[in-house]
A protein has these predicted regions:
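Solvent-exposed interaction patches of small proteins and small membrane subunits
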Residues: 1-113
């Protein structure tokens, strides 16, 4: 694996762990998530950063692993967050944080081990 891809996967994993820690800290409650701007923005920023990092993975790595990880969707989430102009769908972000981020973390752990 390319050294830069390796480093980016480490950073992606750290952002996944950050999202998990925010959920533990603030609670796994959707109403708290949508009403606490610090919680919401912390998760959104991590998801945004994950998308940025995914975008900078080499095309070869993304192609090789696309059956295991939907890189285009991850990159699309970054674009959606960047260009939604205050119209971020909290439910989509919540589902991403609770369902997709743990899978991405496990993928990173597997590839990095």
């Amino acid at each position: 694996m390319d050294k830069l891809d390796w480093q980016k996967l480490i950073h992606i994993k750290v952002h996944c762990e950050d999202v998990e820690s925010f959920i533990k800290r603030f609670g796994c409650d959707y109403d708290v998530f949508v009403n606490d701007r610090a919680y919401f923005n912390a998760v959104a920023m991590c998801v945004f950063q994950i998308g940025e990092l995914a975008n900078s993975l080499t095309p070869e790595f993304r192609e090789k692993t696309k059956k295991d990880m939907p890189w285009d969707m991850i990159r699309g989430m970054r674009n959606w967050l960047a260009h939604s102009y205050g119209e971020v769908d909290a439910e989509v972000l919540w589902e991403t944080a609770n369902n997709d981020i743990p899978k991405l973390k496990e993928f990173c752990i597997k590839v990095l081990s």
